[in-house]
From Swiss-Prot:
The gene is SCRL16. It is found in: Secreted. Belongs to the DEFL family. InterPro entries: SCRL. This is Putative defensin-like protein 238. The keyword Amino-acid biosynthesis does not apply.
Length: 87
C-alpha cells in the first residue's frame, strides 16, 4: 500500500514539473517579416507598421524592429505578429 501511495505522489509531482516549464512561447497567430531600407529609429514598432502597410484586419499584436548588420547595414528587419490564431 505504501509503494502505491509513493507512486501516485511521484506521478503527481512529475505532472506538475513537466507542465510548469518556463521559457516556452506559445504561438500567437500569424507572423510576417520583411527587410526594408533605413534604420528602426526611436519607435521601431511604428516604423514597421508603416513600412509593412498592414491592413486593419491583421490586428497587429506586436511588431519588432531590428537594425541589420554586415551586408545589409543601413537596413532594418520587421517582424509583426497578429492576435488571430489559426491564420
Amino acid at each position: 500500500m505504501r509503494s502505491i501511495t509513493w507512486f501516485i505522489v511521484f506521478c503527481v509531482f512529475m505532472f506538475i514539473a513537466l507542465n510548469h516549464v518556463k521559457g516556452q512561447v506559445k504561438p500567437t497567430g500569424c507572423q510576417g517579416g520583411q527587410r526594408y531600407r533605413g534604420k528602426c529609429g526611436t519607435n521601431g514598432t511604428k516604423t514597421c507598421v508603416k513600412d509593412m502597410m498592414l491592413p486593419k484586419l491583421f490586428k497587429t499584436k506586436r511588431c519588432d524592429c531590428q537594425d541589420m548588420l554586415g551586408t545589409f547595414k543601413g537596413w532594418h528587419f520587421c517582424t509583426c505578429y497578429s492576435g488571430r490564431p489559426g491564420c
